[in-house]
């Protein structure tokens, strides 16, 4: 090979080697930049997550609204029944009314905010608090240990037990009268459902999600009896002909109270303080006489009403 050709070959080889080295450096530099960028993004994400976690710890669960947040919004959201006279229902004028609603209105007034009502069914009461759909539940809510694991109960304002209403042509005065083919109506999510399931598993239960559907089924004689809070079955029987509350107290004596989301301490404490003030002014006796007297009469007043702090 001539010297000229050897020189050309050497030049080509040198250029190729240079290109390889430069390409390698460029690739290495790009990889380092990507790595640095990834490390930076990872650090930023970590810092953001830590910040969000710290913020969540400072503000609570993020599900409920604190007392200050409710005040700042100018509105408190309260879950009540819309079809359960005389505790929570919508009257002929389209307004919420009833014993529970009297307390709800007063709490909003004392807090200095408007009230927004959200209609609830018995089975939704815990869920609405757990998801933050409402700030407070005021829907004939019986205090139980099981529920207290999921929500925080305020001080009670009413006494309650379970009761059983039946048709006048077959009055049930003892659960032993219920035959193996008979059914008892209950509403899903109530203490009546829990009690009968645990203590009388042989009794067949016909379950309904809503009070209105349970009432209609019972009126149509789809079951021999209807078990619910005694306050509710007494109200039902007193408001219609053909029914008798043969069992006025079943199980233990319990209480009814407002409930807030688990851990919402600021709202819980404020409600308890306000209810203690209401107890001092006999607010709950006044509310009874306004909304419940025509249903239960004067004889039940001191038995049912609880004045917090008194």
What are these regions (language model features)?
Residues 27, 58-61, 191-208, 245-249, ...:
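Ligand-binding clefts/hinges and TM-proximal coupling segments of bilobed small-molecule sensing domains
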Residues 58-140:
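Extracytoplasmic small-molecule ligand-binding "clamshell" domains
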Residues 127, 141-149, 197-198, 219-220, ...:
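A ligand-binding cleft/hinge motif common to bilobed small-molecule-binding domains
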